[in-house]
Amino acid sequence: MAEFSGEPRGEGRRIVVVASRFNEGVTVPLAEGAVSALVGKGVAFDNIDVLWVPGAWELPVAVRRALSSERYDAAVAVGAVIRGDTPHFDIVAGETARGLMEASRDFDVPVTLGLLTTDTLEQAEARAGGVHGNKGADAALAALEVLDLFDRALPANDYDEDGE
């Protein structure tokens, strides 16, 4: 049996961080945490782009557009959806996560989820550089780890259109 895992190595990588402006008191630290983690693992600062979108709902379409450019090795999506008194939370959180997963699947590129879905602002702040760490940084490190795993164990196939 063979076992493989990746390490969060950033040298030579080009990463896009797509961040939601809504709840910016939380999302700015998430985006900053992602960028800091990427640079800390060797991604050149000039190889990181940060795209700001209005809200979490717009994260999937922006990630798809970024990946369609073929400029990026991975995407890190960060945002915060905080529960209110209506079912809006469930729709936005679920469909945003689904859209990001579909982008990853469709483009065969890691898209990591730094989307906080919390009941309160305090819970979100605790996960955006507070007592529970920075989930933007965690998502960035996960992207690098998956890329390294792919390099080590799951290289892309160079098939022609006939699958040969």
UniProtKB/Swiss-Prot annotation:
GO terms for molecular function: 6,7-dimethyl-8-ribityllumazine synthase activity. Catalyzes the formation of 6,7-dimethyl-8-ribityllumazine by condensation of 5-amino-6-(D-ribitylamino)uracil with 3,4-dihydroxy-2-butanone 4-phosphate. This is the penultimate step in the biosynthesis of riboflavin. 5-amino-6-(D-ribitylamino)uracil binds at F22, A56, W57, E58, A80, V81, I82, L113. It catalyses: (2S)-2-hydroxy-3-oxobutyl phosphate + 5-amino-6-(D-ribitylamino)uracil = 6,7-dimethyl-8-(1-D-ribityl)lumazine + phosphate + 2 H2O + H(+). This is 6,7-dimethyl-8-ribityllumazine synthase. HAMAP family: Lumazine_synth. (2S)-2-hydroxy-3-oxobutyl phosphate binds at D85, T86, R127. Keywords: Riboflavin biosynthesis, Transferase. The active site is at H88. CDD domains: Lumazine_synthase-I (cd09209). GO terms for cellular component: cytosol; riboflavin synthase complex. Pfam families: DMRL_synthase (PF00885). Its EC number is 2.5.1.78. Pathway: Cofactor biosynthesis; riboflavin biosynthesis; riboflavin from 2-hydroxy-3-oxobutyl phosphate and 5-amino-6-(D-ribitylamino)uracil: step 1/2. Gene3D superfamilies: Lumazine/riboflavin synthase. Belongs to the DMRL synthase family. Coiled coil: none annotated. It is an enzyme of class 2 (transferase). GO terms for biological process: riboflavin biosynthetic process.
